[in-house]
Protein backbone atom coordinates (compact mmCIF):
# COMPACT_ATOMS: atom_id res chain seq x y z
CA UNK A 1 0.00 0.00 0.00
CA UNK A 2 2.86 2.41 0.80
CA UNK A 3 4.33 1.93 -2.68
CA UNK A 4 0.94 2.52 -4.25
CA UNK A 5 0.50 5.81 -2.38
CA UNK A 6 3.97 6.96 -3.46
CA UNK A 7 3.14 6.12 -7.07
CA UNK A 8 -0.06 8.15 -6.95
CA UNK A 9 1.77 11.08 -5.38
CA UNK A 10 4.49 10.95 -8.04
CA UNK A 11 1.90 10.74 -10.80
CA UNK A 12 0.09 13.78 -9.38
CA UNK A 13 3.37 15.71 -9.23
CA UNK A 14 4.11 14.89 -12.86
CA UNK A 15 0.66 16.02 -13.90
CA UNK A 16 0.93 19.26 -11.93
CA UNK A 17 4.28 19.99 -13.56
CA UNK A 18 2.51 20.30 -16.92
CA UNK A 19 -0.89 21.50 -15.72
CA UNK A 20 -0.74 25.28 -16.17
CA UNK A 21 1.32 25.39 -19.36
CA UNK A 22 -0.83 26.72 -22.20
CA UNK A 23 -3.92 27.03 -19.99
CA UNK A 24 -6.84 28.97 -21.45
CA UNK A 25 -9.70 30.90 -19.88
CA UNK A 26 -12.11 28.24 -21.17
CA UNK A 27 -10.55 25.55 -18.98
CA UNK A 28 -8.59 23.72 -21.65
CA UNK A 29 -5.04 23.99 -22.94
CA UNK A 30 -3.55 25.16 -26.24
CA UNK A 31 -0.04 23.83 -26.89
CA UNK A 32 0.52 24.02 -30.62
CA UNK A 33 3.30 22.04 -32.26
CA UNK A 34 6.65 23.85 -32.63
CA UNK A 35 5.39 26.78 -30.56
CA UNK A 36 7.03 28.32 -27.49
CA UNK A 37 4.36 26.65 -25.38
CA UNK A 38 5.28 23.21 -26.69
CA UNK A 39 8.94 24.14 -26.10
CA UNK A 40 8.11 24.79 -22.44
CA UNK A 41 6.43 21.38 -22.16
CA UNK A 42 9.58 19.72 -23.50
CA UNK A 43 11.83 21.65 -21.11
CA UNK A 44 9.74 20.49 -18.15
CA UNK A 45 9.92 16.93 -19.48
CA UNK A 46 13.72 17.16 -19.69
CA UNK A 47 13.89 18.35 -16.09
CA UNK A 48 11.72 15.48 -14.86
CA UNK A 49 13.96 13.03 -16.69
CA UNK A 50 17.12 14.47 -15.16
CA UNK A 51 15.54 14.10 -11.72
CA UNK A 52 15.58 10.35 -12.39
CA UNK A 53 19.26 10.47 -13.28
CA UNK A 54 18.49 9.91 -16.96
CA UNK A 55 20.17 11.49 -19.96
CA UNK A 56 18.33 13.76 -22.38
CA UNK A 57 18.50 13.50 -26.18
CA UNK A 58 16.97 15.85 -28.75
CA UNK A 59 16.84 14.47 -32.29
CA UNK A 60 17.05 16.23 -35.65
CA UNK A 61 13.39 17.24 -35.73
CA UNK A 62 13.15 18.35 -32.10
CA UNK A 63 11.70 15.21 -30.52
CA UNK A 64 12.89 14.74 -26.94
CA UNK A 65 13.98 11.48 -25.32
CA UNK A 66 14.80 10.73 -21.70
CA UNK A 67 16.99 7.63 -21.60
CA UNK A 68 18.84 5.34 -19.21
CA UNK A 69 20.93 3.75 -21.97
CA UNK A 70 23.01 4.51 -25.04
CA UNK A 71 22.70 0.92 -26.26
CA UNK A 72 20.55 -0.45 -29.07
CA UNK A 73 17.69 -2.81 -28.31
CA UNK A 74 15.90 -0.36 -26.05
CA UNK A 75 12.18 -0.14 -25.34
CA UNK A 76 10.67 3.18 -26.37
CA UNK A 77 7.64 4.44 -24.44
CA UNK A 78 6.29 7.59 -25.99
CA UNK A 79 3.54 10.02 -26.85
CA UNK A 80 3.29 13.78 -27.41
CA UNK A 81 3.14 17.04 -25.43
CA UNK A 82 1.37 19.32 -27.91
CA UNK A 83 -2.40 19.70 -28.07
CA UNK A 84 -5.24 20.84 -30.26
CA UNK A 85 -6.77 24.25 -29.61
CA UNK A 86 -8.67 24.10 -26.32
CA UNK A 87 -7.53 20.52 -25.84
CA UNK A 88 -7.61 18.30 -22.79
CA UNK A 89 -4.82 17.99 -20.24
CA UNK A 90 -4.42 14.21 -20.46
CA UNK A 91 -4.14 13.75 -24.24
CA UNK A 92 -0.53 12.82 -24.98
CA UNK A 93 0.73 13.86 -21.55
CA UNK A 94 -0.59 10.64 -19.98
CA UNK A 95 1.61 8.55 -22.28
CA UNK A 96 4.75 10.52 -21.45
CA UNK A 97 3.96 10.36 -17.73
CA UNK A 98 3.50 6.59 -17.99
CA UNK A 99 6.98 6.25 -19.45
CA UNK A 100 8.52 8.31 -16.65
CA UNK A 101 6.76 6.16 -14.07
CA UNK A 102 8.10 2.96 -15.66
CA UNK A 103 11.60 4.42 -15.66
CA UNK A 104 11.23 5.34 -11.99
CA UNK A 105 10.03 1.83 -11.08
CA UNK A 106 12.94 0.25 -12.94
CA UNK A 107 15.42 2.46 -11.11
CA UNK A 108 13.94 1.92 -7.65
CA UNK A 109 13.63 -1.86 -8.08
CA UNK A 110 17.08 -2.27 -9.62
CA UNK A 111 15.67 -3.64 -12.88
CA UNK A 112 18.18 -3.21 -15.68
CA UNK A 113 16.15 -2.56 -18.80
CA UNK A 114 17.28 -0.33 -21.68
CA UNK A 115 14.54 2.28 -21.76
CA UNK A 116 13.74 5.55 -23.48
CA UNK A 117 10.77 7.81 -22.90
CA UNK A 118 9.94 9.90 -25.96
CA UNK A 119 7.91 13.05 -26.57
CA UNK A 120 7.20 13.54 -30.27
CA UNK A 121 6.80 17.01 -31.71
CA UNK A 122 3.65 18.31 -33.39
CA UNK A 123 1.53 15.17 -33.20
CA UNK A 124 -1.63 17.22 -33.65
CA UNK A 125 -2.60 18.97 -36.87
CA UNK A 126 -3.86 22.21 -35.31
CA UNK A 127 -0.85 24.38 -36.16
CA UNK A 128 0.08 23.22 -39.67
CA UNK A 129 -3.00 21.30 -40.83
CA UNK A 130 -0.81 18.20 -40.83
CA UNK A 131 -0.36 15.71 -37.99
CA UNK A 132 2.36 13.37 -36.65
CA UNK A 133 5.17 15.56 -37.98
CA UNK A 134 7.81 14.67 -35.38
CA UNK A 135 7.17 10.92 -35.44
CA UNK A 136 6.40 10.80 -39.16
CA UNK A 137 9.69 12.38 -40.21
CA UNK A 138 11.93 10.07 -38.15
CA UNK A 139 10.20 6.86 -39.27
CA UNK A 140 10.46 7.74 -42.99
CA UNK A 141 7.01 6.19 -43.39
CA UNK A 142 4.55 9.08 -43.32
CA UNK A 143 6.07 11.91 -45.31
CA UNK A 144 7.47 10.82 -48.65
CA UNK A 145 6.94 14.33 -50.00
CA UNK A 146 8.40 17.65 -48.89
CA UNK A 147 6.32 19.35 -46.18
CA UNK A 148 8.45 22.44 -45.69
CA UNK A 149 5.80 24.61 -47.37
CA UNK A 150 3.25 23.97 -44.62
CA UNK A 151 2.26 27.21 -42.89
CA UNK A 152 1.66 27.69 -39.17
CA UNK A 153 -1.27 29.66 -37.79
CA UNK A 154 1.14 32.58 -37.40
CA UNK A 155 1.95 32.48 -41.11
CA UNK A 156 5.44 30.99 -40.84
CA UNK A 157 6.50 28.03 -42.96
CA UNK A 158 7.63 24.78 -41.37
CA UNK A 159 10.86 25.07 -43.36
CA UNK A 160 11.55 28.50 -41.85
CA UNK A 161 10.79 27.27 -38.34
CA UNK A 162 13.11 24.29 -38.76
CA UNK A 163 15.87 26.47 -40.15
CA UNK A 164 15.57 28.91 -37.24
CA UNK A 165 15.74 26.04 -34.73
CA UNK A 166 18.61 24.22 -36.43
CA UNK A 167 16.42 21.24 -37.33
CA UNK A 168 16.12 19.30 -40.58
CA UNK A 169 13.18 18.06 -42.61
CA UNK A 170 15.31 15.12 -43.79
CA UNK A 171 16.48 13.41 -40.58
CA UNK A 172 18.07 10.01 -40.13
CA UNK A 173 15.61 7.18 -39.64
CA UNK A 174 15.13 6.22 -36.01
CA UNK A 175 16.99 3.03 -35.15
CA UNK A 176 17.96 0.81 -32.25
CA UNK A 177 14.56 0.35 -30.67
CA UNK A 178 13.31 -3.15 -29.96
CA UNK A 179 9.69 -2.31 -29.17
CA UNK A 180 7.41 0.69 -28.86
CA UNK A 181 4.64 1.19 -26.32
CA UNK A 182 2.18 4.06 -25.97
CA UNK A 183 -0.42 4.53 -23.29
CA UNK A 184 -3.20 6.84 -24.46
CA UNK A 185 -6.52 8.10 -23.23
CA UNK A 186 -9.49 6.61 -25.04
CA UNK A 187 -11.10 9.02 -27.49
CA UNK A 188 -14.27 7.02 -27.96
CA UNK A 189 -16.68 4.92 -25.92
CA UNK A 190 -15.47 1.32 -26.34
CA UNK A 191 -14.05 0.95 -22.83
CA UNK A 192 -17.16 2.41 -21.25
CA UNK A 193 -19.44 0.12 -23.23
CA UNK A 194 -17.26 -2.88 -22.31
CA UNK A 195 -17.23 -1.74 -18.67
CA UNK A 196 -13.47 -1.99 -18.41
CA UNK A 197 -10.72 0.51 -17.63
CA UNK A 198 -7.90 -0.58 -19.94
CA UNK A 199 -7.81 -2.02 -23.44
CA UNK A 200 -5.21 -3.01 -26.03
CA UNK A 201 -5.69 -1.33 -29.39
CA UNK A 202 -5.73 -3.69 -32.36
CA UNK A 203 -6.15 -1.14 -35.16
CA UNK A 204 -5.83 2.62 -35.50
CA UNK A 205 -7.84 4.87 -37.80
CA UNK A 206 -5.48 6.97 -39.89
CA UNK A 207 -6.21 10.72 -39.81
CA UNK A 208 -7.24 12.47 -43.01
CA UNK A 209 -7.60 16.24 -43.37
CA UNK A 210 -9.41 18.12 -46.12
CA UNK A 211 -9.47 21.80 -46.96
CA UNK A 212 -12.72 22.84 -48.62
CA UNK A 213 -13.27 26.08 -50.51
CA UNK A 214 -16.86 27.22 -51.13
CA UNK A 215 -17.73 29.85 -53.71
CA UNK A 216 -21.11 31.33 -53.05
CA UNK A 217 -23.42 33.69 -54.90
CA UNK A 218 -25.65 35.91 -52.82
CA UNK A 219 -29.16 36.54 -54.09
CA UNK A 220 -31.55 38.88 -52.32
CA UNK A 221 -35.14 39.77 -53.03
CA UNK A 222 -36.56 43.27 -52.89
What do the predicted segments below correspond to?
Residues 219-222:
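Conserved small/polar residues in nucleotide/adenosyl-binding loops
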Residues 2, 6, 87-90, 126:
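Alpha-helix capping and helix-loop boundary segments enriched in small/acidic/polar residues
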Residues 199-216:
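Short beta-strand elements
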Residues 23-69:
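A non-catalytic alpha/beta surface segment that caps or lines the substrate-entry region
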